[in-house]
Amino acid sequence: NNEKPSIKKLGLNCYESAFFTKKVVDKMIFSYAIKISVFIIIYIILMIKSINIELLLVITQTLFSAEVLFYFIKLCYYKFQLDKICKEFQDIFFIRGLSNDNANVLLLNITMDYECLKSFCKIASSSKIFFKNNKEWSEEWTNLLKKIK
């Protein structure tokens, strides 16, 4: 982002961060949902078969521990809030435009919402997913940036 220091530059930097974070979280939530689904399927099979009570107990403790379920719920919340924030940035940059009287106020508000969301959720984005998809997402971001300027 080659903008001179301004609220627009702050908004663009935050939008870029939210854009990439949303892309990573979308993939993270999918893989985490698959892991939980596998646990649940194994759990149901073991409950029906009642073969190995010790394994069933370990899976029960893992699957239903507050940490695993809470993390998944928090990840879902994070995803939905990121979707909302990215739509708000799109609204300002593509629909309302930066010439709108309230554009700076709206950009600051969305930027604060994004920073507060990151602070509240405390979810680290997967660098593995990011680096694997960075080229494709960077091209997509560059195309978006061209439409904004």
PLM regions: where:
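Membrane-proximal, non-transmembrane interface segments of integral membrane proteins
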Residues: 1-28
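Alpha-helical transmembrane segments and their immediate juxtamembrane boundary regions
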Residues: 26-84
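Short, Lys/Arg-enriched charge-dense amphipathic segments
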Residues: 18, 48-64, 115-132
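Cytosolic/matrix-facing juxtamembrane and C-terminal tails of multi-pass cellular membrane proteins
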Residues: 74-148
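Amphipathic, well-ordered alpha-helical segments in soluble domains
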Residues: 14-17, 40, 85-88
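Residue-identity detector for threonine
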Residues: 21, 60-62, 111, 142
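Regular secondary-structure segments
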Residues: 19-22, 26, 42, 90-93
